[in-house]
């Protein structure tokens, strides 16, 4: 099968990026050595829909070293980096993704990696799993199981599982402690502001930053905005999270209220229509909107285009929309993921943990192929605590940190037994 990428000649630039993250992902380096010897994925086809940048490319390399036949596509039209795709193809992996893909090109890539009949699926947002269930049902028996990286993808899986429409086991990677406690909070917090700052080149200190959603990602974005000197306002639909935001020192109000006072808006919800036409009309002249959730539906860009009396590029990756009231609203990266469409994503050291969870979860599926539950309605699987702890212990060891252990007497005191 011939790969479909933008320009194979870009592989040298991509290789430099991948080499940089290799040096900063020691957990994956250890797994690469182990997988190279044990070949846990020998004879298996792995299909991935991922944000195709240097760190995910390194994960693909690790799985390939483990014996897998790799088929890779993007999970977002703007997050694929063409030089990274070229580097992977140069290494002999199969890639079907281009930066700036049209909707047709994007779903063509999804179809390409499904049509090979994968045994393991690694998904980011749920498009791969959804399509195999709706358009390629004859290939479902080939699938041992899959891994889902995101909150949005897990919500889609939960809906499918509840309706008994999910027909193979899925590992809920996003729910692992070593994933959401670190990547979602610290990774998103840093990478979102990296994307915003490098794109706008504006100061954050003294501005009103509105963060929509106070899950782990929203907490990270809010924390880093506060650290940059912003006055942070949180909007929420969950009363518990709203109280948590208040007690963390942030203002909480409805989006309708926040729209009138915000300078920078960041959506981190995974839901659609978080910022709508009504909100745009209330915003200040020069308000900046961006999305750090998943799909490009959180900020209603399509509605903004319809209501604008004109729009034009304001700067690379920023579009200016002129409203009939005379105000201008700025949208970063077309409302797609600001940390990937306008940046390089989460820091390598953070993704080292998340991708170690991914790799070990994929291995878990293969190791437990004959015993894992395949009953409809019971297809969702937590990452085993042993895997979570293994990743945490490896990371601490890499940092040169040792921690205490319970004595037998302490263990008996806490948990009983003899």
Q: Which ranges hold each PLM region?
A:
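Rossmann-fold NAD(P) dinucleotide-binding segment
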Residues: 30-33, 64, 115, 129-130, ...
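Ligand-binding pocket scaffold of soluble enzyme catalytic domains
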Residues: 5-7, 16, 29, 36-37, ...
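Adenosine-phosphate binding glycine-rich loop
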Residues: 10-25, 41-45, 53, 168-206, ...
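Glycine/serine-rich phosphate-binding loop and adjoining beta1-alpha1 elements at the start
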Residues: 1-41, 72-80, 85-207, 415
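Gly/Ser/Thr-rich loops at beta-strand to alpha-helix junctions
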Residues: 48-56, 76-80, 126-128, 216
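Glycine-rich phosphate/diphosphate-binding loop of Rossmann-like nucleotide-binding domains
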Residues: 50-68, 183, 187-261, 267-269
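ADP-ribose/adenylate-binding Rossmann-like module
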Residues: 74, 121-124, 137-152, 271, ...
């Amino acid at each position: 099968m011939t790969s479909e990428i933008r320009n194979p000649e870009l592989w040298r630039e991509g290789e430099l990026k991948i080499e940089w993250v290799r040096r900063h992902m020691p957990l994956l380096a250890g797994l690469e050595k182990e997988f190279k010897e044990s070949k846990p994925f020998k004879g298996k086809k792995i299909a991935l829909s991922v944000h195709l940048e240097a760190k995910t490319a390194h994960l693909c390399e690790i799985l390939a070293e483990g014996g897998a036949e790799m088929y890779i596509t993007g999970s977002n039209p703007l997050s694929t980096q063409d030089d990274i795709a070229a580097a992977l193809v140069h290494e002999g992996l199969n890639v079907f993704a281009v930066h700036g893909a049209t909707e047709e090109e994007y779903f063509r890539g999804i179809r390409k990696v499904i049509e090979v009949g994968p045994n393991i699926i690694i998904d980011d947002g749920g498009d791969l799993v959804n399509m195999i269930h709706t358009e390629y049902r004859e290939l479902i028996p080939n699938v041992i199981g899959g891994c889902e990286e995101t909150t949005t993808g897990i919500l889609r899986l939960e809906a499918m599982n509840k309706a008994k429409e999910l027909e193979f086991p899925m590992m809920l990677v996003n729910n692992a402690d070593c994933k959401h406690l670190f990547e979602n909070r610290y990774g998103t917090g840093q990478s979102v502001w990296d994307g915003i700052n490098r794109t706008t080149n504006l100061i954050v200190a003294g501005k009103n930053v509105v963060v929509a959603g106070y899950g782990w990602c929203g907490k990270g974005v809010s924390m880093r905005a506060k650290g940059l000197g912003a006055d942070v306002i949180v909007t929420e639909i969950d009363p518990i999270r709203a109280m948590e935001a208040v007690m963390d020192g942030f203002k909480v109000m409805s989006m309708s209220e926040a729209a009138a006072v915000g300078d920078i808006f960041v959506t981190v919800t995974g839901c659609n229509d978080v910022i709508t036409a009504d909100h745009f009309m209330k915003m200040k002249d020069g308000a900046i909107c961006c999305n750090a959730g998943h799909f490009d539906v959180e900020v209603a860009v399509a509605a903004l285009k319809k209501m604008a009396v004109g729009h034009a590029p304001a700067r690379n990756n920023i579009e200016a929309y002129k409203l009939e009231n005379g105000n201008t609203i700025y949208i970063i990266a077309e409302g797609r993921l600001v940390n990937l469409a306008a940046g390089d994503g989460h820091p390598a050291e953070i993704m080292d943990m998340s991708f170690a969870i991914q790799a070990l979860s994929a291995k878990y599926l293969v190791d437990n192929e004959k015993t894992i539950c395949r009953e409809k309605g019971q297809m969702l699987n937590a990452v085993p605590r042993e895997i979570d702890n293994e990743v945490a212990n490896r990371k601490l060891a890499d940092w040169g940190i040792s921690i205490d252990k319970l004595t037998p007497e302490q263990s008996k005191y806490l948990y009983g037994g003899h």
